[in-house]
């Protein structure tokens, strides 16, 4: 099995954001748009919290949520 390369390494981020990113990557092979959208919502709020706690800049947050949104297949 080849390892998939992703733009963001979850372990580079605060624990709660790392967890939601890892959940997203784990669900990605299934291609379930509804499930991925739910996890994306968690990433959305986790990045907002990380930004409030100064773990992310606003630009980093925007890039992360846009990247994960692009990975969700069309329903």
Stretches with model-predicted labels:
Residues 1-75:
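Acidic, Ser/Pro/Thr-rich low-complexity regulatory regions
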